[in-house]
Amino acid sequence: MTVIADTSRCFILPDLISYCQFPLRCNPHRDAAQSSTSWLINNYPGMSPEQLVEVRRLDADTLASYCYPDCDVERLRVASDFLAILFHLDDITDTMEEGGTEQLEGTIMDAFRSEGKLDQREDEPRVRVPAKDLWTRFIRNAKPCVQTRLRDNIALFFKTAREEARDRERGVLLDLESYINMRRGTSACLSCFALTEYSIGIELPQYVVDDPIVQALNQSANDLVSWSNDIYSFNNEQAHGIHNMIVILMKSQGLGMQDAIDYVSDLFKQTIDGFMENTQLLPSWGAAVDADVRLYVQGLQDWVVGNLHWSFATERYFGKRGAEIKATRVVELLPKKPVS
């Protein structure tokens, strides 16, 4: 399709879906699993009207169904609820100061270290309730190393979110390399990849997780999800004055908006090519472990392609015009929001 647009008011999304050759799969239990939206709202009273809007338009159920297509209903529900609370944490830390992010981290990590035995407190932070409920259900079936990996990677998310908050308070603009390193933590993708193990009932040995090729595959999948997200979320984030990879390139390298978007698109394509090359370089650890590794790598691919398609199904990035924009790839630039 030939796309013609007024580049002063619009930009063109790169066709990442066509370049990504991974098949899109969907969990057959999608409709049987209850709504994560209702779960989060019911377990987390007192959210602001703006937060409720974001939760309701997220559609974590579809994302979980695309990214964890092989699990049963119970595990799909846990995965969907995890994604719902994770996106909520991402939203609220985007505007928090460092101290607030640190307090939030303490609340969540307290729940995630609890082994499901936390007593309710009268003064308990509201977000602790859904976090505690989620963790209690997760550890019923999650193997020990998978629990540790998810918890450690949530801790990494908060560590980098605190660093991001500190930079935001100080008006620091990161260079591209520094931003990419931070984004690998703030994306929280590695915790989602731990859920891949959980969803299919495997537990990769630590020596496999530490293997350089497996590490490279994890990093590439993380980058692919993060960079496509930065492209798709750019319009909303620029309107609210939030920096992402596009803005970093525009300010640090003097690129125009469309050139910056195309730059990230090129990085995406190079990275997916590298991912495919690395899948052919995996060593062998014996038939049983190799079979689990194949399932895990398939799960990384499910995450990459699932995130691409979900980005147009959710109303988070393009409102109710997702299907239209998926077809045309033309996005009208939103006006800047006034600073409150």
UniProtKB/Swiss-Prot annotation:
GO molecular function terms noted in the UniProt entry: metal ion binding; terpene synthase activity
InterPro entries: Isoprenoid_synthase_dom_sf (IPR008949), Terpene_cyclase-like_2 (IPR034686)
Its EC number(s): 4.2.3.-, 4.2.3.100
Binding, Mg(2+) 3: N229, S233, E237
Enzymatic reactions: (2E,6E)-farnesyl diphosphate = delta-cadinene + diphosphate; (2E,6E)-farnesyl diphosphate = bicyclogermacrene + diphosphate
Keywords of the record: Lyase, Magnesium, Metal-binding
Catalytic EC class: lyase
UniProt-annotated binding residues for Mg(2+) 2: D90
Residue ranges annotated as motif DDXXD motif: 90-94
Site (Plays a critical role in the stabilization of intermediate cation): F87
Essential cofactor(s): Mg(2+)
Functional description taken from the UniProt entry: Terpene cyclase that catalyzes the cyclization of farnesyl diphosphate (FPP) to various sesquiterpenes, including bicycloelemene, alpha-gurjunene, 9-epi-caryophylene, bicyclosesquiphellandrene, bicyclogermacrene and delta-cadinene.
Chain residues that bind (2E,6E)-farnesyl diphosphate: R316, Y317
Binding site for Mg(2+) 1: D90
Protein name stated in the entry: Sesquiterpene synthase 6
Family named by the database record: Belongs to the terpene synthase family.
Motif window: NSE/DTE motif: 229-237
Xref: Pfam families: Terpene_syn_C_2
